[in-house]
Amino acid sequence: MNAIQFRYFKGVMTKEPLKTIIDTWYKLRAERDKKLTNIFNTIPFYESWLGDETSIFGIVCSYDNPARDEAVLTKGYRTEDYKGKCVVKPDRRYKVGKDFDKKLQAIRQILKEAPDFSSYSLKELGMYLLVGNFSRLYFSVSGVQDDIYIAKIPVKEQGNFGDDFLEIHECLTEIKESEFLSIQGL
């Protein structure tokens, strides 16, 4: 089994095309947040969601939230304890649950259409790669620290499968892993 090798890069966020990429991403994120807020405003017990930037599994609220008490008493909602909070999920056997599930499905679709910055920026730069071996799959990741864009890109070598390494955008400079870690404060 071949170990996956990585290449590391950095760039300055105030230089093009990184500046345009992050500005565009912020605009897309604002549009996403507005759509989400419109739906969340229709859910009286909403405080946050259980999931991540691309998925939702339920609505999180505090146990002392008065709207949660009403949800518990209404057929169509299921509640679960998660890290000291209440997670409300739909019970699709009832109309209220089916309606709530439609809202969660709409939220899922919005989240799916609005990628995280790492994925978005790498795709815009043509550097989003997947490389694997027999036991694991690795993908490109990126982030920003103090206006420095950093990226970690897997390299396909003999015995591995996945995307071939492409040309690196001219706005990026290759760096060593130690500098990549240092920029992150590690």
From Swiss-Prot:
Pfam families hit by this protein: DUF5420 (PF17457)
InterPro entries: DUF5420
Identification of the protein by name: Uncharacterized protein HI_1487
Organism of origin: Haemophilus influenzae (strain ATCC 51907 / DSM 11121 / KW20 / Rd)
